[in-house]
Amino acid sequence: MNAPLGGIWLWLPLLLTWLTPEVSSSWWYMRATGGASRVMCDNVPGLVSRQRQLCHRHPDVMRAIGLGVAEWTAECQHQFRQHRWNCNTLDRDHSLFGRVLLRSSRESAFVYAISSAGVVFAITRACSQGELRSCSCDPKKKGTAKDSKGTFDWGGCSDNIDYGIKFARAFVDAKERKGKDARALMNLHNNRAGRKAVKRFLKQECKCHGVSGSCTLRTCWLAMADFRKTGDYLWRKYNGAIQVVMNQDGTGFTVANKKFKKPTKNDLVYFENSPDYCIRDRDAGSLGTAGRVCNLTSRGMDSCEVMCCGRGYDTSRVTRMTKCECKFHWCCAVRCQDCLEALDVHTCKAPKSADWASPT
């Protein structure tokens, strides 16, 4: 009897996770609000008291976070552009993504990580651009230092990523820290993985000073890489995400399949398998793939066979304006003609049942 009971206790926290209704990060809705601090803070639904406090105290930081939402959602959509679930957002939903993130899936893990990374990136960039009263360039990067190439002087404006990480942790994690359930711990883990991903690509840039461009003196600073690098890295982590269950005391994770390694702080973790996203499903938050463009010659996730879930596809002939007959003219211009190009566009058929058309 002990073994079955032990199994029940191991899975009980996961069952409780599935029944947890409030898992969305309502601060994501900040991209749809604007204006003065009080107006914005009081009109974002679902913020906890700590988040509202930070919102009122740092209106300039909140504006940076709000602008950053558009950037990280665009990056999410870029990474999922060839998949059945394409990180589509719902403008009228305060959770931004609807019910799809109620499931503790790989997709949820990625969204929490990329959103947390986006906050770090947006705040750090705003610091360096002098847009925030509470921070500026990294104050620790002063004086002389050494690297593999020799001695250099810290100069310019080093990105103050430590401030960005500190504020992001305080603001983004506030709601999850109030929760004691397994999903909150999952979100906190993936939030941290996202923050660490941005810092991973902090790079040292230098400028040489000397006669004829020689490097007699070097001035260096630390700069964040383009956010695409963070997105690409987290995408790889999404593909290698580790399914976990809560341990018996509810303080950490255990791998669901003992053949896999224990997740590190850099890995993404999830509890539930993803739906197939083939049809519109109100409960799963899936919009389905009916009408999605597919690639007839691909063998990947964007292929018509995979994207359309075996339902087949429709083909339509469309024309578009392109540049053609381009010629180089001395000096120094390339001149092209405008030409009409005809091409076939393939879109996924809808399921035969009319149920797919019901609103999400």
From Swiss-Prot:
Residues bearing a lipid moiety (O-palmitoleoyl serine): S212
GO biological process: atrial cardiac muscle tissue morphogenesis; canonical Wnt signaling pathway; cardiac epithelial to mesenchymal transition; cardiac muscle cell proliferation; cell fate commitment; cell proliferation in midbrain; cell-cell signaling; cellular response to transforming growth factor beta stimulus
Keyword Disulfide bond: yes
Pfam families: wnt
Disulfide-bonded cysteines: C76-C87, C127-C135, C137-C157, C206-C220, C208-C215, C278-C309, C294-C304, C308-C348, C324-C339, C326-C336, C331-C332
Keywords assigned by UniProt, alphabetized: Developmental protein, Disulfide bond, Extracellular matrix, Glycoprotein, Lipoprotein, Secreted, Signal, Wnt signaling pathway
Entry GO MF terms: cytokine activity; frizzled binding
GO cellular component, one term: extracellular space
Positions in coiled-coil regions: none
Principal place of residence: secreted
Cellular compartments annotated: Secreted, Extracellular space, Extracellular matrix; Secreted
PTM note: Palmitoleoylation is required for efficient binding to frizzled receptors. Depalmitoleoylation leads to Wnt signaling pathway inhibition.
Residues listed as glycosylation sites in the UniProt record: N295
Keyword field contains Phosphoprotein: no
Main function: Ligand for members of the frizzled family of seven transmembrane receptors. Functions in the canonical Wnt signaling pathway that results in activation of transcription factors of the TCF/LEF family. Functions as a upstream regulator of FGF10 expression. Plays an important role in embryonic lung development. May contribute to embryonic brain development by regulating the proliferation of dopaminergic precursors and neurons.
Family named by the database record: Belongs to the Wnt family.
Protein name (database record): Protein Wnt-2
The species this protein was found in: Equus caballus
Gene: WNT2
